[in-house]
């Protein structure tokens, strides 16, 4: 029997082909990650909140409302993982059209807060490698400073009231098909070859625009 429970959330389509991130992320890896793992979080979230008051809220509102609730931990985990993955896909851009340069305003902030772009990249990779077990590594704006944040499991900056600019998924399902247990190689490849720096810069610029409004 087909369920009639409302499904307020949907799996976002990728803005690029499954093969577009090759040779750094294979079509097989991306399809498994997006179509199976991400979809499972969306389906579970809909099952948990469909037809409830939470189901009428935005994803960000659900995350903030459930972040500190032990009773709603499962809802938080699935809502946050849906948000995290949706953001992660946008952090990457097809290799054939990628502009490897970092926009000037963003580069200025990175150099100011980390010393150099290379130092930032090294710290980002180190934080991801050092994340014990499953989680995410983020570039965030905390106050007026850029910082790197590693979060466990589904946790994210939205739940902590911080602005996410960039993320990399360090759950094994994000890289195991292509990199097996070589998380350092995956992280270095991500930061050197896959990041859409224009998207990262736009996240920072959007915050400034909001403040000026």
How would you label these PLM feature ranges?
Residues 1-213:
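Feature for soluble, non-membrane regions of globular proteins
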């Amino acid at each position: 029997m087909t369920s009639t429970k409302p499904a307020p959330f949907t799996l976002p389509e990728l803005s690029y082909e499954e093969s577009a991130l090759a040779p750094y992320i294979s079509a097989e890896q991306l399809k498994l990650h997006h179509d199976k793992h991400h979809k499972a979080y969306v389906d579970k979230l809909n099952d948990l909140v469909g037809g409830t008051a939470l189901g009428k809220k935005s994803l960000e509102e659900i995350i903030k409302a459930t972040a500190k609730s032990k009773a709603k931990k499962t809802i938080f985990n699935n809502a946050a993982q849906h948000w995290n993955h949706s953001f992660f896909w946008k952090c990457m851009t097809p290799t054939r059209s990628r502009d490897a340069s970092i926009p000037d305003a963003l580069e200025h902030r990175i150099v100011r807060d980390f010393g150099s772009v290379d130092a930032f990249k090294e710290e980002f990779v180190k934080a991801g490698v050092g994340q014990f077990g499953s989680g995410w590594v983020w570039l965030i704006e905390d106050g007026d400073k850029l910082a790197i944040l590693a979060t466990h499991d589904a946790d994210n900056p939205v739940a902590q009231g911080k602005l996410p600019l960039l993320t990399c998924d360090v759950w094994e399902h994000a890289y195991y098909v292509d990199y097996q247990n070589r998380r350092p190689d995956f992280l270095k490849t991500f930061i050197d070859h896959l990041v859409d720096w224009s998207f990262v810069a736009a996240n920072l610029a959007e915050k400034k625009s909001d403040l000026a409004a």
